[in-house]
Amino acid sequence: MRNERAEGAGPATRDEIEDFAADWYRKLDEHVATADIVPLVLDQGLEFVVPEATLRSRNEFGQWLVGGGGHPGVYNLFFDEVHTVRSVEVPPAGTSVPRVQVKVVVNWQARRWHPPAPRSQWIGFDAFQTWEMVRSPDTGKPVIARYVVDELRPMPGSPPL
């Protein structure tokens, strides 16, 4: 049994953040509906930095996922995705800052197809990320306020992104 703070009280706990990371990547792998993943990022004040864009709202994040606003949609570009969390580093308990800085390393493998190629192409990377998590003002649950892909390190044999 976990010893967690009540939802909405203080900064997110290690257990909450680890559970969040697992759920986050499961949802990305399954290409869940935007309504099921967009609430996991802060709406006002979001900074979501990926190699191809910086997103600043839930609306922009949703467009980045499924297409719109000049984004092709990562759900449209990649398939058979598998994210494997390698590590989640959280500051020690007792930190009283409202934003918790988290270091995440995730292995990401997927396939993509560039028409008119006869076959799809495997890609694989270790993604080194920094997250800042806060509690949602609406739900009290942890959400991503800042998400930065610090490095995408290609696996042996992977073409560049």
Predicted regions and their residues:
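Short beta-strand edge/turn micro-motifs at domain boundaries
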Residues: 2, 95-101, 115-161
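Soluble ligand-binding/transfer domains with enclosed cavities or grooves
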Residues: 68, 72-95, 104-116, 121, ...
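Short beta-strand segments enriched in hydrophobic/aromatic residues
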Residues: 41-42, 104-110, 148-151
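A broad structural signal for short, well-ordered beta-strand segments within beta-sheet-rich domains
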Residues: 12, 16-17, 76, 85, ...
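Intrinsic-disorder-associated interaction segments
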Residues: 6, 10, 14, 54, ...
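A solvent-exposed, acidic/Ser-Thr-rich amphipathic alpha-helical stretch
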Residues: 34-35, 39-98
